[in-house]
Amino acid sequence: MLDPNLLRNEPDAVAEKLARRGFKLDVDKLGALEERRKVLQVKTENLQAERNSRSKSIGQAKARGEDIEPLRLEVNKLGEELDAAKAELDALQAEIRDIALTIPNLPADEVPVGKDENDNVEVSRWGTPREFDFEVRDHVTLGEMHSGLDFAAAVKLTGSRFVVMKGQIARMHRALSQFMLDLHTEQHGYSENYVPYLVNQDTLYGTGQLPKFAGDLFHTRPLEEEADTSNYALIPTAEVPLTNLVRGEIIDEDDLPIKMTAHTPCFRSEAGSYGRDTRGLIRMHQFDKVEMVQIVRPEDSMAALEEMTGHAEKVLQLLGLPYRKIILCTGDMGFGACKTYDLEVWIPAQNTYREISSCSNVWDFQARRMQARCRSKSDKKTRLVHTLNGSGLAVGRTLVAVMENYQQADGRIEVPEVLRPYMNGLEYIG
């Protein structure tokens, strides 16, 4: 959520920045609502003061032995007017808040202006795509050769966009997640967390999934005996529970940064993706991801974004997977991001790079929703923290990249050296 004071005091400047990302802010509507809010605020305060004054007069008149009935009726009338004004003010403030919850974050000044993914800017490349002297197989074919990817079984169990992994392919999938967690905890300074896969509405509001993206979530049916408290949704990413761990907290600045990681399944409806990536593991309703989250001082967040992106890059480098780093343009960034880097890994069978990590600085956009603050040791003042999140990495897509980049002419899959300790020294699948 944007700073309400910024919306009130600099609406045109905010509208200009939001226009860079294709969002039209209705400045006139917000201005009219704000003017009405000011009028109602003053009216409410005046009625409150008048009622207090008249209430005090009742006691004084009673002490003088005067008839207090006219004053009492006047106080009652003022009370009714005050209640009506408060109700109108509350409704107006709720309307303003509902609008504010649909407004995306402002883009950082250095973010390239653009409409969609075609306007993203490549920053760098690492590694050289391998040249094969045989016909490249895609991961689906390789998975079927080794009886490791069973999409038909998943359709029987659930439906499309799910998979059953088996044998050494399932083992490599597990090895990848363990390798990522060990790297981030042992070398990059993150603490490992195990978090719920079901979260409540407040949590989803905190990180910005609600109210705007309710349709992208899988919602549970509330338990009849807990209807008021069990309205849960499956997490679309571990960013949601990890970031919300600081919701409502005041953190000493000396305890920052807080760096957290978790390996979880992620659940997404993929609304609007009908017909895209229908083959294989690229776009699933359920997929595993190792997530990184940082909670930092505001002045440290841009440096933290560079660091976090480097941590995701390290996973790809140690696996020997060619990739490119791009900065997303204003029109392609996520709702809460002010700046985002995507890492795209080389997928031989598609002869292209595909997203495997997205690392974003969210500034105080989530912290304002969550009321997550830090306290200075010197003056004891509090301010909103900045939050960052990044994939380190999407495990299924990493499996795809390893299978395809490490395939052999006979269909075997070489196990990258860094994964062999997690697979009992296995050098090849097949």
Curated annotation (Swiss-Prot):
GO terms for biological process: selenocysteine biosynthetic process; seryl-tRNA aminoacylation. InterPro entries: aa-tRNA-synt_IIb (IPR002314), aa-tRNA-synth_II (IPR006195), aa-tRNA-synth_II/BPL/LPL (IPR045864), Ser-tRNA-ligase_type_1 (IPR002317), Ser-tRNA-synth_1_N (IPR015866), SerRS_1_N_sf (IPR042103), SerRS_core (IPR033729), tRNA-bd_arm (IPR010978). Belongs to the class-II aminoacyl-tRNA synthetase family. Type-1 seryl-tRNA synthetase subfamily. CDD domains: SerRS_core (cd00770). Changing residue 355 to Q: Loss of serine activation activity. Keywords: Aminoacyl-tRNA synthetase, ATP-binding, Cytoplasm, Ligase, Nucleotide-binding, Protein biosynthesis. Gene3D superfamilies: Bira Bifunctional Protein, Domain 2, Serine-tRNA synthetase, tRNA binding domain. Its EC number is 6.1.1.11. Consists of two distinct domains, a catalytic core and a N-terminal extension that is involved in tRNA binding. Catalyzes the attachment of serine to tRNA(Ser). Is also able to aminoacylate tRNA(Sec) with serine, to form the misacylated tRNA L-seryl-tRNA(Sec), which will be further converted into selenocysteinyl-tRNA(Sec). GO terms for cellular component: cytosol. The keyword Ligase applies. GO terms for molecular function: ATP binding; identical protein binding; magnesium ion binding; serine-tRNA ligase activity. The keyword Disulfide bond does not apply. Homodimer. The tRNA molecule binds across the dimer, one part binds the N-terminus of the first SerRS subunit and the other part to the active site of the second subunit. This is Serine--tRNA ligase.
